[in-house]
């Protein structure tokens, strides 16, 4: 009976994982500085940019992209929700160094659609990482591609990166 309980426990714990792919790991040095006029590093993301507000894309700007970069990618994840992908935007131009709306090429997010999914934590405080990757070449990934395909392409072409982290707190649950 004890072996059966241990086996059931191991199976339950294994089921708590995530099918979300890991973020790019070989992204070059963290030389890019990402900022937002809506929130500071580590600060609360205003309600306007969450599911309880309008759900707008927060305005982002960045500096420090190497001159050799041919394109930029932007990945927004919630690491507190097993790397839930809120947005994967690819092959953005290197100039202007800003984004405040939809991108021409977007991979599917964890919701299964393209585009921005605003933060909506079920309970507690969640961290949202807005990471900009400088790419040595456009990824060539098609709009609507799977997240894993896009992340592999970013990993292959990233020469530098930088992250801005904001938080959203919820008392629901």
Where are these regions (language model features)?
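N-terminus-centered regions that define maturation/targeting leaders and the start
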Residues: 2-6, 12-173
């Amino acid at each position: 009976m004890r072996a059966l309980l241990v086996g059931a426990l191991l199976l339950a714990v294994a089921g708590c994982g995530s099918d979300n792919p890991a973020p790019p790991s070989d992204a070059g040095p963290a030389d890019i500085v990402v900022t937002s006029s809506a929130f500071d590093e580590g600060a609360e993301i205003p309600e306007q940019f969450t599911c309880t507000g309008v759900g707008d894309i927060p305005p982002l700007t960045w500096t420090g992209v190497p001159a050799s970069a041919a394109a930029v990618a932007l990945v927004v994840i919630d690491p507190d929700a097993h790397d839930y992908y809120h947005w994967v935007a690819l092959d953005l131009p290197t100039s202007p160094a800003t984004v405040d709306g939809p991108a021409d090429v977007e991979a599917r997010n964890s919701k299964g659609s393209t585009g921005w999914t605003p933060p909506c934590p079920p309970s507690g405080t969640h961290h949202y990482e807005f990471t900009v990757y400088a790419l040595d070449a456009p990824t060539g990934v098609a709009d609507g591609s799977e997240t894993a395909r896009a992340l592999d392409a970013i990993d292959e072409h990233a020469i530098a990166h930088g992250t801005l982290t904001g938080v959203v707190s919820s008392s629901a649950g």
